A protein has these predicted regions:
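Pocket-edge structural micro-motifs
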Residues: 10, 71, 156
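Glycine-rich beta-alpha-beta "Rossmann" dinucleotide-binding loop(s) and their flanking helix/strand
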Residues: 10-12, 19-49, 160-191
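Short, charge-rich binding segments
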Residues: 11-14, 58-60
Length: 191
């Protein structure tokens, strides 16, 4: 940082006035046992994950059951969880399957529509209304503690962050947004 210079992999140096390292996030599936594409939930955060989720969805609609969708603690982008819930709801309705699929949205947000931003306009009321209209239940202030095949373990917290209720949510299909971390190459670099 003192020299405004970065060394490249081939040994060359690049001088700069301002340096932005835009790497995208590290998806921290490993923070929760059983989370993610190598565990028991799906992700849409990467093209490869979305392709796998689509394949699993096609199998799911042949033998539907409960869905758990949402964002775990440490996630910083909540909109895709709502969007994906509404996409699944719409597809299930078109297939005349929605009445056979209970849906629960699990989020670490303090309230529906917080979106990691303290809300956007009247997002709380609009999203609560949209979820109710679609018969999608929700759990806020949630911490996913473990995911097993067919069961998501969730601790619901009160406003002070104290555990309020334990949930063991059954699911046949789940898409959960993971925590986002800095990639290994830049974590711990000063400046």
């Amino acid at each position: 940082p003192a020299e405004n210079r970065v060394e490249l992999a081939d040994g060359r140096f690049l001088d700069y006035d301002y340096l932005v390292i835009a790497t995208g996030p590290k998806l921290a599936f490993d923070e929760i046992e059983g989370l993610g594409p190598t565990g028991h939930t799906h992700s849409v955060c990467h093209v490869d994950h979305a392709v796998k989720a689509e394949s699993a969805w096609q199998a799911f609609v042949k033998d539907p059951g409960p869905i758990v969708v949402g964002a775990v603690q440490g996630a910083s982008c909540f909109g895709p969880a709502y969007e994906f819930a509404f996409i699944m709801d719409t597809d299930l309705r078109r297939r005349k399957l929605r009445d056979r699929v209970p849906m629960t949205l699990v989020t670490s947000e303090p309230y529906i529509g917080h979106l990691g931003l303290g809300g956007v306009g009247d997002s709380k009321t609009m999203l609560e209304s949209a979820l109710r209209e679609r018969h999608i239940k929700w759990i806020c202030n949630a911490k996913v503690t473990k995911v097993e095949a067919g069961t998501m373990h969730v601790t619901e917290h009160d406003e002070e962050g104290k555990p309020k209720k334990e949930h063991a949510l059954p699911f046949r299909h789940s898409m959960m947004l993971p925590s986002f971390k800095g990639i290994d190459a830049v974590v711990g670099i000063e400046g």
